[in-house]
Amino acid sequence: MKLTSYIRSYECPQETIEGAIELFGMCKDMDFTVPGKVGMGDVDKTIKDSEDVYLESLPMFPLHEFGMDSYVKHIDEACQDYLDSIHLGYYQLRMLGLPQIQHYPPKGGYFQEHIDSYSNSTCNRIIGYITYLNTVDNGGGTHFPHLNHTEQAVAGKTIFFPSGVTHAHKGVVAPDEHKYILVGWFGPSC
């Protein structure tokens, strides 16, 4: 049986790309990055090798100066368009907190196939999104094994997809390049 892909892509404002990478650099300089977490918040570099910034934990930063306010507006509008495109526009979803900035070094990645709504703390994730902040020429994309589909990492591209088992995914390792993304989720508005 062939699964139907519900992956859709949108273009992100250029100011978001530049602002997010600048913000990540500032956070790294100030030791505000954390090792990437998997599962129930564990750090396991054999599964995920990244440095992450949780924008929710930066209340003292003027995020609007880095374009994050326009990004959030863009993502909200794109999510509604996405839901309309898959004939689910009647659902009222909300962004589940601010997105995360994730940096994958060369040979880093989220190596294990996973879904984004797998535990009690993440079961409210209905729609996931990834914005690629830089173009990666060799690897760096997102692979959806059950769909036999890979999204390439192209600066400014945002993809939306269901967070459940039909769209399990994993990172494609970039052997020689860095990869920067913004990730987040939408869930019930109740």
Question: Where does each model-flagged region fall?
Answer:
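Short, conserved beta-strand element in jelly-roll/cupin
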Residues: 101-105, 119-138, 186
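Catalytic core of Fe(II)/2-oxoglutarate
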Residues: 113, 124-125, 138-190
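Acidic, glycine-rich loop-and-strand cores that form catalytic or ligand-binding grooves
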Residues: 89-105
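A generic structural micro-feature
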Residues: 2, 93, 119-125, 174-176
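Histidine-centered catalytic micro-motifs
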Residues: 110-118
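Non-heme Fe(II)/2-oxoglutarate
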Residues: 1-90
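Conserved active-site beta-strand-loop modules that form the wall/rim of enzyme catalytic pockets
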Residues: 99-100, 109, 140-141
